[in-house]
Amino acid sequence: KLAGMKYIVITAKHHEGMAMWDTNVASFKDYTGKTMFSLQQYTPFGKTGRDVLMELKTACDKAGIKFGLYYSIIDWNHSSQTINGDFTKMKSMAARTAYIRDMKAQLKELVDRYDPAIMWFDGDWTYRRKAPTLAKWWTKADGKDLYKYVKSLKSSILVNERVCRGFKLGDFECPERSIPEKAPSRPWETCQSMNDAWGYKKDLENSYRSYKYLIRELVDVASKSGNYL
């Protein structure tokens, strides 16, 4: 807040599929198919009954900081999909239909419970322009539909372009670890990490970017009317 932060985006579900809230959507179970794959079921923190997303949401509201949630479209753990490199492959078209339905149910949980100002999608890499296949199972039409669905849950929510990138969808552009030479025509942000990883990597724990590097990027982004996430 003192540094000028206006909003945050916290991971609700990343590619590995663990829900950081007490989801009730039945298909999001662990590899055994018996236990919900969530923070509440898998960690000592969650089993105390605490809700990390709500605690952070409450703190943001108190500080006047907008609260955003990150959600991955692909899910390495979900029974509908198999891991295909960094991507996933659908087991069948019926599984694809059911997964998209259940993904929307999780998104409704998140919007209803936490009232986020931003829904930040990722994991749309398997996209196609036209009809889906099992390997390229996400389409431009799916992205448009997902955007419309989230807006139906909360009309004022901001949604990034990664409902299906490359087609000018969503409310703002979000290049990753890069800054365009010229300011984009639409609202935009770029996302950056403090080191070369988006999560814990033992060999990178002490290789943080210098404050001069980060401030230089922040100034460059701000000079082009962007946000620095």
Descriptions of predicted regions:
Residues 1-229:
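Mature catalytic domains of secreted/periplasmic carbohydrate-active enzymes
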